[in-house]
Structure formats: structure tokens, C-alpha cells
């Protein structure tokens, strides 16, 4: 299916690009989240009219994301989890737990934006984590997992 992108999408293209994607990806992800539209003649003409408005909106989103990225930069987030004597956690700290902790601090971050380089955190201590606030803004934070005695 050919679609026209209404915003920048990672590994796909920028605002206004006409790209071919699999039907399921377009129908189930891009179109419902208003990241793209089908590339019909009417949609392309409508996009040409609204392009300046969409570019302004994209610039505002980027500016807001950069402001959040500056606040998040070099942040140390402390998460408590039950652990054994050797520091191994009972369970793990996932991207969902980190997103919830960030929401408690006042940030609106989705769990899919939290990138754990080595998978879920299973040891107490400091762990570097990347948070993708926007496709162009990635903030590096440190997660300090504090082991609580069970």
C-alpha cells in the first residue's frame, strides 16, 4: 500500500514522503495513529494544501520534545525492587516500570519510548537507559535500581 507520511517515522521517512509499506503496518499502526494517509489523488492534493500547517505542527512537537529531553538529560531515576543478598532482583525492572516511574515524576513517556539496551534490568545498581522522546530527540538517563531486602 502506498501512503503519504504526515510526520517523521523512524526507519520509514519524513513528513510528506510517499512510501510503500505492508498493508497491515499501514492499517493497524500508521493510519490509526494519524502518522500517515493512503496516497490517493485527493489525499496528495489535500496534503499539498495543508503541508505548511503540518510542518508548523511538527516543529512545535519537536520543540516540546527537546524541552523534555533537556529536563531528562543526565537524570538519575531511583526504582526500588525486592532483591536477594547478592543483588539479584526477584523479578526485573522493565520499560513499563521505568515509564511508570517517569510518569510519577511528571513526564508523559510511553513504555515503547524506553529503550533498554540489554533487556530488562535484573541486578541492583546503576544502568544507562535511552528514552526516545521524539524520533529526533533521545535522552540518556540512569536508572538506579535499589535492592530492598525481602
From Swiss-Prot:
Record keywords = Ribonucleoprotein, Ribosomal protein, RNA-binding, rRNA-binding
Extract the InterPro entries matched here: Ribosomal_bL9, Ribosomal_bL9/RNase_H1_N, Ribosomal_bL9_bac/chp, Ribosomal_bL9_C, Ribosomal_bL9_C_sf, Ribosomal_bL9_N, Ribosomal_bL9_N_sf
Q: What is this protein called?
A: Large ribosomal subunit protein bL9
Annotated Gene Ontology MF terms? rRNA binding; structural constituent of ribosome
Its gene name is rplI
A GO biological process held by the record: translation
Top-level taxon of the source organism: Bacteria
UniProt family annotation: Belongs to the bacterial ribosomal protein bL9 family.
Any one Gene Ontology cellular component term annotated for this protein: ribosome
According to its UniProt entry, the function of this protein is described as: Binds to the 23S rRNA.
Species the sequence originates in: Polynucleobacter necessarius subsp. necessarius (strain STIR1)
Amino acid at each position: 500500500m502506498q501512503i503519504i507520511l504526515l510526520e517523521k517515522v523512524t526507519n520509514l521517512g519524513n513528513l510528506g514522503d510517499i512510501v510503500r509499506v505492508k498493508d497491515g503496518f499501514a492499517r493497524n499502526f500508521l493510519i490509526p495513529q494519524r502518522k500517515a494517509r493512503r496516497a490517493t489523488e485527493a489525499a496528495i492534493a489535500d496534503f499539498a494544501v495543508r503541508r505548511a500547517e503540518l510542518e508548523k505542527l511538527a516543529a512545535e512537537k519537536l520543540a516540546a520534545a527537546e524541552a523534555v529531553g533537556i529536563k531528562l538529560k543526565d537524570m538519575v531515576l531511583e526504582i526500588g525492587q525486592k532483591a536477594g543478598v547478592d543483588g539479584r532482583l526477584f523479578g526485573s525492572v522493565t520499560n513499563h516500570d521505568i515509564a511508570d516511574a517517569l510518569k510519577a515524576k511528571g513526564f508523559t513517556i510511553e513504555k515503547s519510548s524506553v529503550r533498554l539496551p540489554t533487556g530488562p534490568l535484573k541486578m541492583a545498581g546503576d544502568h544507562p537507559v535511552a528514552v526516545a522522546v521524539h524520533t529526533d530527540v533521545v535522552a540518556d538517563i540512569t536508572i538506579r535500581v535499589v535492592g530492598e531486602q525481602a
